[in-house]
Amino acid sequence: MATFKDACFHYRRLTALNRRLCNIGANSIWMPVPDAKIKGWCLECCQIADLTHCYGCSLPHVCKWCVQNRRCFLDNEPHLLKLQQLKHPITKDKLQCIIDLYNIIFPINDKVIRKFERMIKQRECRNQYKIEWYNHKLLPITLNAAAFKFDENNLYYVFGLYEKSVSDIYAPYRIVNFINEFDKLLLDHINFTRMSNLPIELRAITQEYFQLSRLPSSKLKQIYFSDFTKETVIFNTYTKTPGRSIYRNVTEFNWRDELELYTDLKNDKNKLIAAMMTSKYTRFYAHDNNFGRLKMTIFELGHHCQPNYVASNHPGNASDIQYCKWCNIKYFLSKIDWRIRDMYNLLMEFIKDCYKSNVNVGHCSSVENIYPLIKRLIWSLFTNHMDQTIEEVFNHMSPVSVEGTNVIMLILGLNISLYNEIKRTLNVDSIPMVLNLNEFSSIVKSISSKWYNVDELDKLPMSIKSTEELIEMKNSGTLTEEFELLISNSEDDNE
């Protein structure tokens, strides 16, 4: 199962390029790191191990040994993991580049075999050869790859020798096989040519090769926000916005496309060595404003929200209530995006004003039938069930029929923020005292989408961007969000 790891250990002594490419963490000293309790293939050493999150993409795809090298397949440094990575769409020319890569880095010929035999004979307690001593020379070329599906057109494939099997239900990738996209007979011929140089007793690799090269492809898994680790998330207490640390190996050398990189691998190895020698481990601080985080935060908000506020007599915002056991939610909102906090305040204030204008209620300790609906309303924000839930909330406010249209009253005083929001939404000069269902629904939707345009939000964090994209966004100033001018300097807001 450690064929690829053993090959990296022995082949790194062949050339100067191999000394840099084949230096993987699995052949180094182990350092303790937290794991994600996910079993799968480490993409760097191709072993089945407990995976931990990568500092480059925040996804669990490296083992506890290889993570110390801080390499990601999204780097632009041409290390081995980067060279094994191809982006969708996959063509036959790209697959040929993978085959050329293995033939260059892990050659099997008479010269290499004699060199390894001399190295083995120099060791102690080697009275007879055993097949496992040659494990590093039994590396077949397969076209199996770990596929990362960020969306329909954004897929990455990391090729490697993935031996054995493991339940990868929680891993962010799936193993796919591109042998049909290449040529089965041609790939067999390439491997048989490599095997012909091996001693007769070692040619049993043929059976292992066929088992690995004919693996069926798994169904691709769509990556969601929950697959990304929380370890790289940083909450900015000044701007009150979440961000994410992204670490990448950055080199000043550039290649127009993947094919040009492999051309330099064959014809200009010194360029790759220079790129790896001059690369810098760079930290990018990016905002974490995406649809996945928005849905997660909305779910947590619905879990922690206190619907009793709509029946209360508190004059302040819902997020500022501290000493009421039925309405206090400040413990949760202290470290949450300020946009979610503002949305929660406006939404709860609006429902409170509408509810108390139409229903005879006591105070926040009252038990009202509308309470479960308010939680459902928050959970349904930005979903297809939003209209249905809004209508149910509206019907719980004792609407009356006027000329065949159900309406509710809005007669309580409004704070300035909600007053301006309703005027802007309804496009009126003065706030109406009567609201129908369409107007009520428009106001709720306007409040929820005040700070979030779902159509323009990325579905996943910025850590899935390539290094070139991160550099370009950093230079253009779009990598982070700045809201200092929108944040109050009052002591209460900065608690």
Swiss-Prot record:
Sorted alphabetically, the Gene Ontology BP terms of this entry are:
symbiont-mediated suppression of host cytoplasmic pattern recognition receptor signaling pathway via inhibition of IRF3 activity; symbiont-mediated suppression of host cytoplasmic pattern recognition receptor signaling pathway via inhibition of IRF7 activity
Q: What are the GO MF terms of this UniProt record?
A: metal ion binding; RNA binding
Traced from the root, the source organism's taxonomic lineage reads: Viruses, Riboviria, Orthornavirae, Duplornaviricota, Resentoviricetes
Q: What does the protein in this record do?
A: Plays a role in the inhibition of host innate immunity by inducing the degradation of key host factors required to activate interferon production such as IRF3, IRF5 or IRF7. Associates with components of cullin RING ligases (CRLs) including CUL1 or CUL3, which are essential multisubunit ubiquitination complexes, to modulate their activities.
The protein's superkingdom reads Viruses
For domains, the record's comment is: The integrity of the zinc-binding domain in NSP1 is important for degradation of host IRF3.
Q: Which UniProt keywords apply?
A: Host cytoplasm, Host cytoskeleton, Host-virus interaction, Inhibition of host innate immune response by virus, Inhibition of host IRF3 by virus, Inhibition of host IRF7 by virus, Inhibition of host RLR pathway by virus, Interferon antiviral system evasion, Metal-binding, RNA-binding, Viral immunoevasion
Chain positions covered by the region annotation Interaction with host IRF3: 320-495
User: Assembly and partners?
Assistant: Interacts (via C-terminus) with host IRF3; this interaction leads to IRF3 degradation. Interacts with host IRF7; this interaction leads to IRF7 degradation. Interacts with host CUL1 and CUL3.
The main location is host cell
Per UniProt, subcellular location reads as:
Host cytoplasm, Host cytoskeleton
The family assignment reads: Belongs to the rotavirus NSP1 family.
* Segments passing through the bilayer: none
> Does Glycoprotein appear among the keywords?
no
Q: Where is this motif: pLxIS motif?
A: 485-488
| Stretches for region RNA-binding | 1-81
Q: Which Pfam families match?
A: Rota_NS53
Q: What name does UniProt use for this protein?
A: Non-structural protein 1
Region span, Important for cytoskeleton localization:
82-177
Q: Which GO terms describe its cellular component?
A: host cell cytoplasm; host cytoskeleton
Location of region: Zinc-binding domain: 42-79
